[in-house]
A protein has these predicted regions:
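Bacterial N-terminal signal peptides that target proteins for export
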Residues: 1-8
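Short, surface-exposed alpha-helix to beta-strand junction/turn motifs within ectodomains of secreted
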Residues: 52-72, 154
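Short, solvent-exposed loop/turn segments at the edges of extracellular beta-sandwich modules
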Residues: 100-106
Length: 335
């Protein structure tokens, strides 16, 4: 019996030694640093950063802008929680530089921007847009607030959150339901083009509206004329709020969407449930046809917007019928 016990102990010792050896070999050949998975503000003061593996860090590893202080740091496996003071405003950009290490000492230095926590995200629709702008009426996108809230941190993409040509993050701004916001996507770059956060009549510039809130896309080039995806998210890396897909369907390339990037974006929005059609996967026939539109024949929803995430929500108004900053026209252009 004693001999059997001795043999069992030897076997257990060998198993433990083997496991330790394998772990040691694994650590010896682990040369990869942790990678960022996600980051977001989870409250006005707390930031959550997630990595691909367990990490270690100390307060001295982080650098914040002047006026911001790191008051606490908590490491929970792959998650890192930072408490920042004073609290950030909704959508306020916070540049953050930091460094973390894994259990064998591989380190990652990173720089990212976290947008202030917004607990009052409104329901917002992309409500009107033009893709065939002119020198006197450049391309614009209008947003309509279905409910009241703060648009701080909301982000518009020409594209999607993972692949885009142009983007704009809105600053903190409390607005009532029924408000209109205009994003001018091809500004002239003149001093009068002011992002309005206190006075809706403050901005000049082409097609600015005295009672809507005007914003100007820096270095904006306008929108793609024939094929494109427009999206609105709660924040960079956040939840999809609204999407629009348009295509003339005249191209023979990439299933009618002309470019691979557009096709990929269409598929991404479809997977998120942001756009629907009779076909699956979506084809250009399921999308808005922008071909009859012009700089003043905008593509818009009804005056009382409907949102079924289909092309049936949309029409092209008659010539001169664009109404950026006010209720949409229900007149329909007939070629």
């Amino acid at each position: 019996m004693m001999r059997e016990v001795q043999i069992l102990l030897v076997v257990i010792s060998c198993v433990i030694a083997s496991a330790c050896l394998e772990e040691g070999i694994e650590e010896a050949f682990d040369l990869s640093p942790p990678e960022l998975v996600s980051w977001e503000a989870v409250s006005e003061e707390e930031i959550l950063i997630t990595f691909t593996e367990e990490v270690k860090a100390s307060p001295d590893d982080f650098f914040l802008p002047q006026g911001k202080t790191l008051t606490s740091l908590t490491v929970e496996g792959e998650d890192l929680r930072l408490t920042i003071s004073p609290p950030s405003l909704p959508g306020e950009p916070l540049p953050l530089e930091g460094r973390v290490r894994d259990r064998v000492g591989n380190s990652l230095t990173f720089f990212l921007v976290v947008y202030g926590y917004n607990e009052r995200v409104p329901e917002v629709l992309i409500n009107e847009f033009t893709t065939q702008g002119s020198s006197s009426h450049p391309d614009c996108v209008e947003l309509y607030l279905v409910t009241e809230g703060n648009i701080g941190g909301l982000v518009f993409y020409e594209g999607t959150d993972t692949d885009w040509d142009q983007m704009f993050v809105f600053p903190p701004l409390d607005l009532p339901a029924g408000s209109f916001v205009i994003l001018h996507t091809k500004p002239d770059g003149i001093p009068g083009e002011i992002d309005e956060t206190t006075d809706p009549a403050a901005s000049g510039g082409k097609d600015s509206h005295p009672s809507a809130w005007d914003f100007w896309l820096p270095d904006g080039k306008g929108l793609s004329g024939n094929n494109g995806v427009l999206t609105l998210y709660t924040r960079p890396g956040g939840r999809l709020l609204d999407a629009v897909v348009y295509s003339t369907g005249t191209s023979e390339r990439y299933e009618g969407f002309a470019q691979k990037k557009v096709l990929d974006r269409v598929r991404e929005v479809e997977d998120l449930g942001g756009w629907k059609g009779a076909s699956s996967p979506l084809t250009p026939d399921d999308c808005i046809d922008p071909d009859p539109s012009t700089a003043t024949r905008s593509i818009c929803r009804a005056s009382v917007p409907q949102d079924t995430d289909t092309k049936e929500d949309w029409h092209i108004v008659t010539t001169g019928g664009a109404t950026f900053g006010g209720p949409n026209s229900d007149e329909v252009y007939t070629p």
